[in-house]
């Protein structure tokens, strides 16, 4: 279906909402995202959002395509899978077509599609995105920090694991179910991460960057109690603390710090000069741990929401 069913003359703005995209539409969206990223310095749509462009329809996911004439000039993705929070969205307008109200049109369409219950990411927190949020009547409620540190001088003490805990690399296929269960427990308070499914895991295992040698699992006996999944961004020469998780029963004993150190040592050994990670600004304990490991804030992503 479309959010504007009225026939319009060539050159008029048109927004179409779809549960899935054709191959040609996916290619056009990916090209739009890449061209915008070259100008903005970061992707307007998260890794999860880009993965959701692949395969077939995704439950709870809708795609909004904004065209002018035959040209795709804007894109938004709306995901409504959180049982508590409002639907979440990301949107982008091609740099050559900004300043013509397309962002406001996409934002208004998202509000209509979501029943005016909406959360929207502004990656990098650019002033134009902040202005658009204000125009749409959205308020800031979440800050996600990207933190970085140099790995060229990274020389930590040997990580100390809690008694009875051993660490080994992830084995694809064999460890999938155990990791998904541990991830769900470790991030029960964080649905974006804790709700990952086998399909989500398979998507990531199919990415060129996936390397099980950098996916560390901590066991106490046969129980998976913690993990650190690292990610190498080869083109940017960045190593990422992709996700660190510790099951509730194993928290408080230093396992998270030990796993973080193990992963950072692995990234440094790959010759990557810089490490990065994402952490919610209001997670004071985690921010403190990372600051003690030498991380500093590099940039901040902002999430806005409607008050309806």
UniProtKB/Swiss-Prot annotation:
The keyword Acyltransferase applies. Residues 1-20 are annotated as: Disordered. It catalyses: 1D-myo-inositol 2-(L-cysteinylamino)-2-deoxy-alpha-D-glucopyranoside + acetyl-CoA = mycothiol + CoA + H(+). One of its GO terms (biological process) is mycothiol biosynthetic process. 1D-myo-inositol 2-(L-cysteinylamino)-2-deoxy-alpha-D-glucopyranoside binds at residues 47, 192, 231, 240, 278. Gene3D superfamilies: 3.40.630.30. GO terms for molecular function: mycothiol synthase activity. CDD domains: NAT_SF (cd04301). Its EC number is 2.3.1.189. Acetyl-CoA 2 binds at residues 244-246, 251-257. Keywords: Acyltransferase, Repeat, Transferase. Acetyl-CoA 1 binds at residues 91-93. Residues 15-152, 165-308 form the N-acetyltransferase domain. PANTHER family: AMINOALKYLPHOSPHONATE N-ACETYLTRANSFERASE-RELATED-RELATED. Belongs to the acetyltransferase family. MshD subfamily. Catalyzes the transfer of acetyl from acetyl-CoA to desacetylmycothiol (Cys-GlcN-Ins) to form mycothiol. NCBIfam families: mycothiol_MshD (TIGR03448). Monomer. This is Mycothiol acetyltransferase. It comes from Streptomyces scabiei (strain 87.22).
